[in-house]
């Protein structure tokens, strides 16, 4: 059997499995407009930057429109093929690596996103090692693809966690894109990955997501401009990780510095978290008061 015949057989089998996996409610319109397409929204060169900011604040300027339904269906197809044939994904950190090398020793404003699997230890105890590797790798790559689709950069994979960051000439758009990405990640888990896993009697995968905004420094460990490891360091990285650790399964938490920059219609979907000083010990670096965190209302 040649490669084309194998592919045709995979697609036919997949469609049968996909029909069974589609026993879920879809919310197709909820996220279609969350992120925006820059190519559709560029203003003519004679318009002032102030006009662009006003339009963006009113929700008129759009950078990228994501077809979330199509993405979820493609996710299902990739996960199914991975489980059956060990399909490999394309590299997704190269873009970030190239970008950071151009900005070594610079301080950059960015929204940082951490997404991590919940209870991965239990998964490792229930499944064969080779299946665990495929599932976790596929999960990480699907999260990375969501980051890329929202004009973000994939910084790195750490165990069963993925770290991304979002930048834009308008930090408000960067914040909106980051939050839209986080929301799509939850949908990908609920509607893309887990239905396929369930068809194999595998347990659901759950995630918790944390975001924060601020300054970070790009550092290079070594003198080789092309090969030495590059990374991002700064308080935003640390706080985003702490915020993520506080999130419940399938929950999105954002720091106040992100909340302040997202569109008012998106802000309405978040509520302030009330934690004791023993639960949350981190203060705002500007005010010295406990740093406020918000959760997305499901």
Protein language model regions, located:
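Catalytic core of nucleotidyl cyclases, primarily class III adenylyl/guanylyl cyclases
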Residues: 150-174, 194-233
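Catalytic/regulatory signature loops of cyclic-dinucleotide turnover enzymes
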Residues: 212, 235-260
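Hydrophobic alpha-helical membrane-association signature
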Residues: 135-139, 181, 236-239
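Short gly/ser/thr-rich secondary-structure transition/capping motifs
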Residues: 92-97, 192-194
């Amino acid at each position: 059997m040649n490669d084309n015949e194998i592919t045709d057989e995979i697609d036919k089998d997949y469609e049968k499995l996909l029909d069974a996996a589609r026993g879920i409610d879809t919310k197709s319109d909820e996220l279609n407009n969350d992120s925006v397409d820059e190519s559709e929204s560029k203003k003519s060169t004679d318009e002032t930057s102030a006009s662009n900011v006003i339009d963006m604040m009113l929700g008129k300027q759009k950078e990228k429109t994501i077809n979330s339904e199509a993405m979820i269906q493609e996710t299902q197809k990739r996960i199914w093929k991975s489980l059956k044939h060990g399909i490999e994904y394309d590299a997704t950190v190269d873009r970030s690596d190239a970008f950071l090398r151009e900005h070594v020793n610079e301080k950059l404003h960015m929204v940082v996103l951490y997404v991590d699997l919940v209870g991965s230890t239990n998964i490792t105890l229930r499944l064969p090692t080779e299946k665990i590797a495929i599932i976790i790798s596929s999960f990480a790559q699907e999260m990375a693809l969501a980051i890329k689709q929202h004009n973000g950069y994939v910084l790195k994979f750490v165990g069963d966690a993925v770290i991304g960051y979002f930048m834009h000439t308008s930090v408000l758009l960067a914040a909106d894109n980051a939050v839209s990405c986080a929301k799509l990640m939850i949908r990908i888990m609920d509607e893309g990955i887990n239905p396929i896993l369930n068809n194999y009697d595998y347990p659901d995968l759950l995630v918790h997501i944390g975001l924060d905004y601020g300054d970070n420094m790009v550092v290079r460990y070594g003198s080789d401009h092309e090969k030495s490891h590059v990374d991002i360091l700064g308080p935003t990285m640390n706080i985003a990780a702490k915020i993520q650790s506080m999130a419940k399964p399938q929950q999105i938490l954002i720091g106040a510095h992100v909340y302040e920059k997202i569109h008012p219609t998106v802000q309405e979907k978040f509520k302030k978290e009330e934690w004791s000083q023993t639960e949350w010990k981190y203060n705002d670096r500007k005010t010295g008061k406990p740093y406020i965190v918000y959760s997305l209302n499901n």
